[in-house]
Amino acid sequence: MTTQPLLIAIAPGIALALIIYLTDWHEREPLRLLLKLFAIGFIAVIPTAIIEQGLLMLNPFTGILSIAFIAFLIAGFTEELVKRHLVIRYALNRVEFDERLDGIIYSVFIALGFATAENINYVVFAFASNPYVGIYRGLISVPAHMLFAITMGYYISLSKFSIDTGLKRAYLRKALVMPFLFHGIFDFILMAQMDIVLLAFIPFTIYLWVTNLKKLNSYYRDSKNNHRQH
């Protein structure tokens, strides 16, 4: 194994994690905690892949229905369920989680750890002979994991800081449902290989970026205002 494919595989996740880390400049989270969350997401790829392989063997469909099953249930639902579980298990109740922006930061670091491990598998091993896979995944797939995580973290924070028990539960459900739907639609568009479906890719990708940057900016402003008051 040469070093170059490995560097290509890990660079996007690390670069995006650094950008998100620098976004939180009013009260940065402990680097040790963020590295731990990144590592947890990285390791979680192994059990997730085992679950996905099991579900793949249970796929009863063929053709376009099979693609939808893989995109939404096997990839979208399974991966986002695992990532949400990790955020709840390892970040939700930490004392450092003291403002809304933190929910996005924690979710993104777990997701980028996950995406980096997944990227190593694709770029270094599964498609090592194709030099374009690393570029494609670095520009499309890894950033997509970050965007799904911004949505997840947005609702995780709404849940944490809500005083209403019903709303807490509703936002936790949304922290799974919305990323799962985004992930499923994203993968389905790419996997379907149908011209009419592929036409939706650019508009949907723009929508993902715009809506999630709005979420990130709203919590950034919230963080900024909180620290002005102190």
Task: Please give the residue ranges for each predicted region.
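Hydrophobic alpha-helical segments at protein termini of multi-pass membrane proteins
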Residues: 1-230
